[in-house]
């Protein structure tokens, strides 16, 4: 849909009315694309809104556009950015990136020292993650909290994950490590192609 004003903001109690639609679209999108997206209970989505840990996009007319949420694990050591979904009518409009950027900034603000991760099989999300500073990692590099992996049981590919003892699956794990980013910023920049050398005055 073109020429509609879209608001991307933190979800509130008033947005719980969209929870059922979000869950339905998440499930139907997984079926249509044949990808592994875990089913999410309506109440779980509603609770994220109550907790102020979700981002929603809606039009000025109140039409739901998109959604994503965050969750802390291991006492805030890790934070997942999950559940990114956009209504089919608004895809390819840039709203997914706007939601992704907002949930990432929320995560950094609420948990500044946490490692932020995302697991996805979608190329578009991988690209957005890379632009934000995420890097591909092994599953051992993200949270080992069993509660997180329990959430994968609603995915059609859970048997693959279980069979590989949660070492890998069809999704790619990507991680943003603030400590690593800070270290890179402190390190002197060096060209990967040319050695360092000093020039002498003639």
What kind of region is each of these model predictions?
Residues 86, 92-107, 116:
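Conserved acetyl-CoA-binding loop-helix of GNAT-fold acetyltransferases
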Residues 11, 84-86, 122:
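Hydrophobic adenine-recognition pocket in adenosine-nucleotide-binding enzymes
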Residues 24-27, 32-88:
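A conserved beta-strand-loop-helix scaffold within acyl/acetyltransferase catalytic domains
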Residues 1-42, 56-59, 183, 188, ...:
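Short amphipathic alpha-helix that is part of the acyltransferase structural core
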Residues 21, 105, 127:
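Surface-exposed charge patches
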Residues 1-3, 108-113, 117-202:
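Terminal substrate-recognition subdomain of acyl/acetyltransferases
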């Amino acid at each position: 849909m073109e020429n509609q004003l879209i608001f991307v903001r933190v979800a509130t109690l008033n947005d719980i009315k969209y929870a059922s639609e979000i869950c339905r679209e998440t499930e139907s999108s997984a079926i249509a694309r044949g990808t592994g997206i875990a089913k999410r209970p309506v109440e779980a989505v509603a609770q994220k809104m109550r907790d102020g840990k979700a981002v929603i996009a809606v039009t000025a007319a109140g039409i739901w556009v998109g959604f994503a949420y965050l969750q802390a694990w291991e006492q805030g050591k890790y934070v997942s950015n999950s559940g990114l979904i956009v209504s089919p009518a608004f895809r390819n409009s840039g709203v997914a990136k706007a939601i992704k950027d907002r949930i990432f900034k929320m995560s950094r603000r609420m948990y500044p020292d946490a490692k932020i991760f995302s697991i996805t099989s979608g190329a578009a999300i991988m690209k957005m993650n890379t632009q934000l500073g995420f890097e591909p990692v092994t599953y051992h590099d993200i949270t080992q909290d069993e509660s997180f992996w329990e959430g994968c049981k609603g995915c059609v590919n859970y048997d693959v994950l279980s069979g590989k003892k949660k070492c890998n699956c069809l999704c790619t794990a990507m991680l943003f490590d603030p400590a690593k980013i800070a270290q890179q910023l402190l390190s002197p920049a060096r060209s990967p192609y040319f050695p360092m050398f000093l020039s002498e005055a003639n």
